[in-house]
Amino acid sequence: MSFKLFIKNLPTNLCCGLIHIYRWTISPLLGSPCRFFPTCSQYALQALKHHGCIKGLGLTIKRIGKCGPWHPGGVDLVPMTTLEEALDISPAVDDDESCDLHA
């Protein structure tokens, strides 16, 4: 990986690292299951991987804002990018999805 690519992906990878820390430390203490599929932390990792740091964080904040008794939950997938829509590719739902960006 080039240094330029490393710097470009650094904010996204830092955010993903923070989400993994949350999943390993705080999430097990909460004990209550997420009302959505994929879970909010899985959603955040996917949003960051597919849309980058700024838009991914925006989508994540919007998703967390839905969390509460006023929303029924259910399936709420990360919106696709234009290229994914054109190729009809849906985002993969993977419990251990990383944010390693190689593009």
Swiss-Prot record:
<keyword id="KW-1003">Cell membrane</keyword>
<comment type="function">
    <text>Could be involved in insertion of integral membrane proteins into the membrane.</text>
</comment>
<dbReference type="GO" id="GO:0005886">
    <property type="term" value="C:plasma membrane"/>
</dbReference>
<keyword id="KW-0472">Membrane</keyword>
<dbReference type="InterPro" id="IPR002696">
    <property type="entry name" value="Membr_insert_effic_factor_YidD"/>
</dbReference>
<comment type="similarity">
    <text>Belongs to the UPF0161 family.</text>
</comment>
<dbReference type="Pfam" id="PF01809">
    <property type="entry name" value="YidD"/>
</dbReference>
<protein>
    <recommendedName>
        <fullName>Putative membrane protein insertion efficiency factor</fullName>
    </recommendedName>
</protein>
<keyword id="KW-0997">Cell inner membrane</keyword>
